[in-house]
Amino acid sequence: DKDSYKVSGGLHGVGVSCVNALSTDMKVTVYSHGKVHQQEYKKGIPQYDVKEIGESDLHGTKVQFLPDDTIFTSSEYKYETIANRLRELSFLNKGIRITLQDHRQVDAEGKSEIEMFHSEGGLREFVDYLDSTREKLIPTPLYMESDKGPIPVEVAMLYNTSYSENVFSYVNNINTIEGGTHVAGFRRALTRTLKSYADKSGMLEKLKMEVTGDDFREGLTAVISVKVQEPQFEGQTKTKLGNSDVMGAVDQVVGEMLNTYLEENPKEAKIIVQKVILAAQARNAARKAREMVQRKNVLSGSGLPGKLADCSESDPEKCELYLVEGDSAGGSAKQGRDRKYHAILPLRGKILNVEKAQEHRIYENDEIKNMITALGVSFGTEEGEKVLNLTKLRYHKVIIMTDADIDGSHIRTLILTFFFRYMRALIDGGHVYIAQPPLYLVKRGKEEKYCWTEEQREAAVKELAKDGKEDSVGIQRY
């Protein structure tokens, strides 16, 4: 409805209708043109016609609703999820103030928890927030904004010393996690402009390899926000933008403003190009390391790691690989497994933190090489040399089974980080699982109960102490 909103995130026009249909009660109050109007609904049915209930200088709409617990199995709101989204919106719409009040959390004085979200710097502050734990290569984010054309474009970007790319894109405040034409336009302009500057400066003359788009984006954190009157999304979930005209708009804005920045800031420009050169050299070394891992697998026959206790089943859909901590856990896991379907791969100590390592170092790490070899995956498809190839995946379930302590949690995080950065297709394909080890074994005689929480432990003790003698119940903590 262009008469109501210049741009909107709505796609089908059913947002409030769906909320109404899924609520036991809903009340909508509209403040407009000095008047206040209201309507209430129960189970989606209006209780009365829209009525005027007073006058006010306020502008906006207030929606109050209660989820229908006959439809939802759980209607508990996660504070962190809501807070993260409101923080995001405050960065995307600089200057606005958003208040989040949680009446479930009350302090000693009986006051509920209140958090205010406000950003004067907008996307600049957003990038600083995203990179707060990383070491910056240049002091302040590059900022680009243009609303001259039909598509307003806003971009902030910053280079850091990490080896990964973090690009977040938004269309009308919607997070397009799969990217789309606005991201394609940004990448095209970034690669073209930086390469042109690097060529003119002569810094690439001694480099004996071709520089690719990936090299220009290593260590980059960027936020792209566009406003589009008629957004066209691929699929129902609004995760990928399809408007072809957005690519050109973003390309032009980023190209012009980045070129100006590089010309006016030669010191920072040199630092960025040096980072690109290092990325190209590391990429070449990583390609050789990947090829070496895959060549060794071919030359050594099956090439399976020596510590892998494989399963006898040959159908990958029925096979499961358990990644466990060390040889001792591997021994216990082997005793409890079903040899037909369960394979066990013990990992020695903590694997490499791939977030802080150059790519070629990753493929030289023994534990990571063992995981790649055991899984049977390779790198390189028609989409690119770094894309994970799952055609020979040996297990359709990969279970990370670490201890229930801090070390176990750390090892699990390191493995998940490696999968997320270099084997994302495993996660997206639903192949990665996390085992939930119990914290306690509650035992009396031959009766045993495993417990995952304190509440379960207390309930198990009461259940097993039938005669009231809790001291006769043994508790083993893992």
From Swiss-Prot:
Site (Interaction with DNA) residue list: K350, N353
Cofactors (names): Mg(2+); Mn(2+); Ca(2+)
UniProt record, GO biological process: DNA topological change
Catalysis performed (reactions): ATP-dependent breakage, passage and rejoining of double-stranded DNA
InterPro entries per UniProt: HATPase_C_sf, Ribosomal_Su5_D2-typ_SF, Ribsml_uS5_D2-typ_fold_subgr, Topo_IIA, Topo_IIA-like_dom_sf, Topo_IIA_B, Topo_IIA_B_C, Topo_IIA_bsu_dom2
Keyword Mitochondrion included in the entry's annotation: no
Pfam families attached to this UniProt entry: DNA_gyraseB, Toprim
Keywords annotated in UniProt: ATP-binding, Cytoplasm, DNA-binding, Isomerase, Magnesium, Metal-binding, Nucleotide-binding, Topoisomerase
Cofactor note (record): Binds two Mg(2+) per subunit. The magnesium ions form salt bridges with both the protein and the DNA. Can also accept other divalent metal cations, such as Mn(2+) or Ca(2+).
Boundaries of every Toprim domain copy: 319-438
Chain positions recorded as Mg(2+) 1 binding sites: E325, D403
Quaternary state and interactors: Heterotetramer, composed of two GyrA and two GyrB chains. In the heterotetramer, GyrA contains the active site tyrosine that forms a transient covalent intermediate with DNA, while GyrB binds cofactors and catalyzes ATP hydrolysis.
Function: A type II topoisomerase that negatively supercoils closed circular double-stranded (ds) DNA in an ATP-dependent manner to modulate DNA topology and maintain chromosomes in an underwound state. Negative supercoiling favors strand separation, and DNA replication, transcription, recombination and repair, all of which involve strand separation. Also able to catalyze the interconversion of other topological isomers of dsDNA rings, including catenanes and knotted rings. Type II topoisomerases break and join 2 DNA strands simultaneously in an ATP-dependent manner.
Note: Few gyrases are as efficient as E.coli at forming negative supercoils. Not all organisms have 2 type II topoisomerases; in organisms with a single type II topoisomerase this enzyme also has to decatenate newly replicated chromosomes.
Protein name from the UniProt record: DNA gyrase subunit B
Organism: Cytophaga hutchinsonii
